[in-house]
Amino acid sequence: MNKIKRALAVGAHPDDVEFFMSGTLMRLGQVGYELHILTIANGSCGSMDLGPEEIARVRRREAQAAAQSIGATYHEGLANDMEIFFERPLLAKVTAVIREVVPEILLVHSPQDYMEDHQ
């Protein structure tokens, strides 16, 4: 019996996985991994022109389309932008996704990243 190999990429915002991890995910998909993408924040602060709810919807659709284009399952944002705190409620949500996916490989931001949300 073959065990399904899974990879989970976790990004702080919509577009982070696409910019920082999509090449690695695509390669993992080519060698048989089931791909998953989790975005912590929903992208609600991602525009100077659109309101928070509208830009969050736009960025969610874009992230879903990007995930679909590489054959990945997209797990939606768990918090609003600017609300990524290292606290139990958010950690519980992230843990729930990790337990659901049970990844062999977990891709995350570099700890030396330029942006606080990425740490």
Label each PLM-derived region with a short phrase.
Residues 1-102:
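Active-site rim/loop-helix segments in enzyme catalytic domains that contact anionic ligands
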